Amino acid sequence: MVDIKPEQTQEGNNNDHLVQSDDPEHPANLIPELCRKFYSLGWVTGTGGGTSIRRGEHIFIAPSGVQKELIKPNEIFVLSYPTPKYPPSARKYIRKPSALNPSACTPLFLAAFDRGAGCCIHTHSQWAVMVTLLVEREKGKSGCFEISNIEQIKGIPRGKGKGMLGFFDTLKIPIIENTAFEEDLTESLEKAMEEYPDTYAVLVRRHGIYVWGDTPAKAKTQCESLDYLFQLAVQMHAHSLPWVVNESA
């Protein structure tokens, strides 16, 4: 048996052992499974979107520009963490599949991991896009998405170590403007994280959303809860129903 040296990259054996496991919860197996589920929900259509998981000192990332529902474990990129966001050439890839491109979402995923996340999901959900447009029309570009008095809000954390939001709480999700290139979103994403320190998601106008969680399971369920709320909000707006209930009215 050939000894595998972790420090080797694509010039050597490419550290294939990092993505080889029979454990369904291993990031190299879980990312393709999650992407298949997200594709079925219309979140990663046409190669859009992405998913990344941090496990210890390794970050596992789906490749860019591929059909997300067809991703295989051996197509997963692996980064050593911590690693620089910029320039891309400084990032510490310890596994790079041949003929595939690293995710353009990488620096945004890293921003979530720098906040302690264990998983970050990026989707192109139509409902997420729609609420960014409705907020812009109603509140202007500086407005954030807000909704209250909906049971599903309980699926969203109140903040790190603060438990979950309650039925009567108002969920607030910041919105940033889209850019021509994905990586150029990083600065405004990090600014939104600073302005909304308790948020676990950032919407991108006319683009989609980034959602992160302490674990892959939490990131997934939070993403599902948010998409439910976005869809409901669009339908509520169509019926002239307010998103935030004014209890004093």
Swiss-Prot record:
Q: Where is the composition biased (Polar residues)?
A: 9-18
Where are the residues of the annotated region Disordered? 1-25
The pathway that the record names for this protein is:
Amino-acid biosynthesis; L-methionine biosynthesis via salvage pathway; L-methionine from S-methyl-5-thio-alpha-D-ribose 1-phosphate: step 2/6
Which of this chain's residues are annotated to bind substrate? C105
Q: Name one Pfam family in it.
A: Aldolase_II
GO BP terms in the entry: L-methionine salvage from methylthioadenosine
Catalytic residues of the enzyme: E151
HAMAP family annotated for this entry? Salvage_MtnB_euk
The record ties this protein, via NCBIfam families, to: salvage_mtnB (TIGR03328)
| PANTHER family linked | METHYLTHIORIBULOSE-1-PHOSPHATE DEHYDRATASE
Query: What name is this protein filed under?
Result: Methylthioribulose-1-phosphate dehydratase
List the gene name.
MDE1
